[in-house]
Amino acid sequence: METAQAALYVVIVLVALALAFDFMNGFHDAANSIATVVSTGVLKPGQAVLFAAFFNFVALFVFHLSVATTVGKNIVQPGIVDTHVVFGALTGAISWNVITWWWGIPSSSSHALIGGIVGAVIAKAGIAALLAAGILKTVLFIFVSPTLGFLLGGLMMVAVAWVCRRQRPMKVDKWFRRLQLVSAGAYSLGHGGNDAQKTIGIIWMLLIATGYTAAADKSPPGWVIVACYTAISLGTLMGGWRIVKTMGQRITKLKPVGGFCAETGGALTLFLATALGIPVSTTHTITGAIVGVGSTRSMASVNWGVAGTIVWAWIFTIPASAVIAAIGYWISLLLY
């Protein structure tokens, strides 16, 4: 009885840790959702985070749990995951998020979590314990999502510039200040839909491993879904202002029309990835879209030094979080 009770306590602590990661994901990635709409002056920071948090939560009613299924069932071989693996994965992801948040670097919470899972699983059972299809799909979209965001953002900017070529700049600005509310809402919807499901996936993985949910179940318990969407929304509400300036102005100067095109390109990319069940980086996606918009003016209008720093952070995210996760896994073996 005592052993079963102790095991339950471990599960409760790990669920709380996963929700803390989800909260931090919202906090860390809030800048992605609101940077352009704040930097263009369409909304004040306080208004923007309320706006983004609302649409993060509404995503619960819009998207199927395809991403949660990928994370929960399609990355690791059945029977490998235990509480130590989940502890290591969350330790790696949270630690990397804190490091990059502190330095104001728009890293990817999503890839930190994937790196955490990979590192902890390899520490326990070796690389053969990973499911190649799920890992390759995720790794492929490390490159596809920012590229698609870049192309869609840039193409939309070119199309809008052509359509509005005979309109007065002040009139165009007025139109797109309103339209940017639509694009920011769509992007926040995509952010909530893809990112909250990653935490749903790891909690689902934990509940299957500990016998609280059957592996054959089509979806996790309802409380897991509601808790994860609530946590990411609250995190977004708290905001991550350190990163907003980097995303919204230091990469390239944005006007409302550019903000609209970047957010719409990013949102379309996220909708596609979520429909396909692919956990992507919302950070990579919106950054690619912002660079795409900036490059339509001239390549010199993009601050490639800042963009380069962000790319290096992306490159290091999965290996760094994997190493920390492996250490976390071994530490957990000493703790319980």
Where are these regions (language model features)?
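Multi-pass alpha-helical transmembrane bundle typical of ion/small-solute transporters
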Residues: M1-Y336
